[in-house]
């Protein structure tokens, strides 16, 4: 027989059924600030020492971007099956927090654990312009 095809109306109907079957997912936290204060910091604790953390993390652009990504991943994982939260911890939270709090990480400028630092950025990595011959290849 002829190959099966889908009409636009069929796709619209399928999308409407999917939308009706699953109500919109409400986030547990309404902002990255709430997520960090109410979930992340109470649940992710480390012994002071080699770790860096700026209590004014919200003044550091990269920290805000990374923590926002972490918050989005948390909100997605909490709606999935139970193993999703374990995967969130192992594959997302742990590596992200290591990057944020390592001595060479985002809060490199903080001298003592928990001491507010000056959220200045180091000079960005430099890049020489690649030759046009390889840029257009």
Predicted regions and their residues:
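Amphipathic alpha-helical interaction modules
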Residues: 43-80
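Amphipathic alpha-helical binding modules
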Residues: 82-137
